[in-house]
């Protein structure tokens, strides 16, 4: 019996008719395409039997090449040969230049600050470059399957934010592909291993690719895949190993000039070749730019040790989020070509206390999982009992009075998901409300990330708290967020789809979760203070309105007592003593109780005036 079966409109396969679907691993260094044939998932090779496609595009005035042919031109035509474009996806030009100062490309900024790469083929953005890689993969699949693809599942790092995910979908559309779903890379690996081995329990997926690192803690049970927690670093991968080794070789060779792009490429190529060789050998000879020398595995390990340690710190945070200890993990799945590095396997094994799984080629496992998922989503497996539950990496919420963040969807909530929460107006006669969408784990707006702002207008002018606005957050299966605000009595509404202009910085990604734990006690105190200050402001504003309307109900002595209490509250509300503010609010409440009762009596008498008892 199927646990969950959702068919895309128009994609229900007719009996005995298989639809053509593919899984695409759009990687930083290499990309792959896979499909399911005769019940088996397999990656598709090119004419020369090569399964990997280098994620490199070489642009010329009359066209472009993708893959190995493009990579071969890198040393001779560096500025027109674009590689590792995935690292630029969803980032601003300023962010890219600060993060990767040695990139050899000619950048120009568009109107909104996004990067444009000046090539022989004209100005191109990262979405266009990614689209050209996707086109090459789709063409390989169509030729191998003898038909056009009906749909694809494309994998992305678990830490990709809205802008990076949207950029990936835009690239697919530009390539003419129908995206069935974006799938987190570690989750795709879990699908591949979960179906093959049938393991049940907690599994860690350690994914170290060319440009990104992801760690996911999953629970597999009776065909249900649930992501308990995710973590990682969107700017850490095997490319960083390569650059560290290239810099070391440069120092050993005495090459001081960094402006020669051809030499830069030779150094990088030599570093990559040495890294690969050191996975099997203890020593490798290097010949570059007229220099010859030896690099040992021990030297390489010393260079990358700090980076490997960073990945293990992320593993520890993810385990804490999932509420499990390293010894609770049954299996550790290794994903990504960089997990072939012996030091990585050794340190990961020591951390989890078990030998990592490498049965499926770590370069291919993500594409294989994506192909299995695509085969299901396209309608070829209507009786599949696999249910996939992804999670959002950071909490989503709204700014409320006092600069506070009210979380609507907590982090690690499974997606797709929709959550609604009701809010009220703060002032009498308020006819509009500013909606400020936030992302993060801290209690104050200043410590979280702003995602979007929009306004709801047309709220009926009622007393403070009289209008009720329902705000709905909806996160789709690809992790993209839309927010809708609706005034319940009139039905007036406004909405926005959150598409940030560029992605989170490394500092934001790495520190937001860590800071939420480090500053937990401080944040709670700050929130309590802010809440009391907001309540004080509300009480004083309400009291001012009441006194303006009905001061005649008070004697001079009563009015003086209320004014004194209000003045004291106004004074202490400027300070940081939560208890003092709370006591001052209670004092105002005590001094105004009789006044409130008289106002209520007066309102009742006015309402009953001219009516008989029978009418009441």
Swiss-Prot record:
Q: Which InterPro entries match?
A: ATPase_NBD, Heat_shock_70_CS, HscA_NBD, HSP70_C_sf, HSP70_peptide-bd_sf, Hsp_70_fam, ISC_FeS_clus_asmbl_HscA
Cite the SUPFAM superfamilies for this sequence. Actin-like ATPase domain, Heat shock protein 70kD (HSP70), C-terminal subdomain, Heat shock protein 70kD (HSP70), peptide-binding domain
Q: Which GO terms describe its biological process?
A: iron-sulfur cluster assembly
Keyword tRNA-binding (UniProt):
no
Keyword list, A-Z: ATP-binding, Chaperone, Nucleotide-binding
Q: Which PROSITE patterns match?
A: HSP70_1 (PS00297), HSP70_2 (PS00329), HSP70_3 (PS01036)
Q: Which GO terms describe its molecular function?
A: ATP binding; ATP hydrolysis activity; ATP-dependent protein folding chaperone; unfolded protein binding
Which is one Pfam family of this protein?
HSP70
UniProt record similarity statement: Belongs to the heat shock protein 70 family.
Report the protein's function: Chaperone involved in the maturation of iron-sulfur cluster-containing proteins. Has a low intrinsic ATPase activity which is markedly stimulated by HscB. Involved in the maturation of IscU.
Protein name, as recorded = Chaperone protein HscA
* Source organism (scientific name): Salmonella paratyphi B (strain ATCC BAA-1250 / SPB7)
């Amino acid at each position: 019996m199927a646990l969950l079966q959702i068919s895309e409109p128009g994609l229900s396969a007719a009996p005995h008719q298989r639809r053509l679907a593919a899984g695409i691993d759009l990687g930083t260094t290499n990309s792959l395409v896979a499909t399911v044939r005769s019940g088996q998932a397999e990656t598709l090779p090119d004419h020369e039997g090569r399964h990997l496609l280098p994620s490199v595009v070489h642009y010329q005035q009359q066209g472009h090449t993708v893959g190995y042919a493009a990579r071969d031109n890198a040393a001779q035509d560096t500025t027109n040969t674009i590689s590792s474009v995935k690292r630029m996806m969803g980032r601003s030009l300023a962010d890219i230049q600060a993060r990767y100062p040695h990139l050899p490309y000619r950048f120009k900024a568009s109107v909104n600050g996004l990067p444009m790469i000046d090539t022989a083929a004209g100005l191109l953005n990262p979405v266009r470059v990614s689209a050209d890689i996707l086109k090459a993969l789709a063409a390989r699949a169509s030729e191998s399957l003898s038909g056009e693809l009906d749909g694809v599942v494309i994998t992305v790092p678990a830490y990709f934010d809205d802008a990076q995910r949207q950029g990936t979908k835009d690239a697919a559309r530009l390539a003419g592909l129908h995206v069935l779903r974006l799938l987190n890379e570690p989750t795709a690996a879990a699908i591949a291993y979960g179906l093959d081995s049938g393991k049940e329990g907690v599994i860690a997926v350690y994914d170290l690719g060319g440009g990104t690192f992801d760690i996911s803690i999953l629970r597999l049970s009776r065909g249900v895949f649930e992501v308990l927690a995710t973590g990682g670093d969107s700017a850490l991968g095997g490319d960083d190993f390569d650059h560290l080794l290239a810099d070391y070789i440069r120092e050993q060779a005495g090459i001081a000039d960094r402006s020669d792009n051809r030499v830069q490429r030779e150094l990088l190529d030599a570093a990559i070749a040495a890294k690969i060789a050191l996975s099997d050998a203890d020593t490798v000879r290097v010949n570059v730019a007229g220099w010859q020398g030896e690099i040992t595995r021990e030297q390489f390990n010393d260079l990358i040790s700090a980076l490997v340690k960073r990945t293990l710190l992320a593993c520890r945070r993810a385990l804490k989020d999932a509420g499990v200890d390293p010894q609770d993990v049954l299996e550790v799945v290794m994903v990504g070509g960089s997990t072939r590095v012996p030091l990585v396997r050794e340190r990961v094994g020591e951390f989890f206390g078990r030998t990592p799984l490498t049965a499926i080629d770590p370069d291919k496992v993500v594409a294989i999982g994506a192909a299995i998922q695509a085969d299901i989503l396209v309608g070829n497996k209507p009786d599949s009992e696999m249910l996939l539950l992804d999670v959002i990496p950071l909490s989503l919420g709204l700014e409320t009075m006092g600069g506070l963040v009210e979380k609507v969807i907590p982090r690690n909530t499974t997606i797709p998901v929709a959550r609604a929460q009701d809010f009220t107006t703060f002032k009498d006669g308020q006819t509009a409300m500013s909606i400020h969408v936030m992302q993060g784990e801290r209690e104050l707006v200043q410590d979280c990330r702003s995602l979007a702002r929009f306004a709801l207008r047309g709220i009926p002018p009622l007393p403070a708290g009289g209008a009720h606005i329902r705000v709905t957050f909806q996160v789709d299966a690809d992790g993209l967020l839309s927010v809708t605000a609706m005034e319940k009595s009139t039905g007036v509404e406004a909405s926005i789809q959150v598409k940030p202009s560029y992605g989170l910085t490394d500092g934001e990604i790495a520190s937001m979760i860590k800071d939420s734990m480090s500053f937990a006690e401080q944040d709670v105190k700050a929130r309590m203070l802010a809440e009391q200050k907001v309540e004080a402001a509300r009480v004083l504003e309400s009291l001012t309105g009441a006194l303006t309307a009905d001061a005649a109900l008070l004697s001079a002595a009563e009015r003086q007592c209320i004014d004194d209490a209000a003045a004291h509250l106004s004074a202490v509300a400027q300070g940081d003593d939560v208890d003092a503010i709370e006591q001052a609010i209670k004092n105002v409440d005590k001094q105004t109780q009789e006044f409130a009762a008289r106002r209520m009596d007066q309102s009742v008498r006015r309402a009953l005036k001219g009516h008989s008892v029978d009418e009441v």
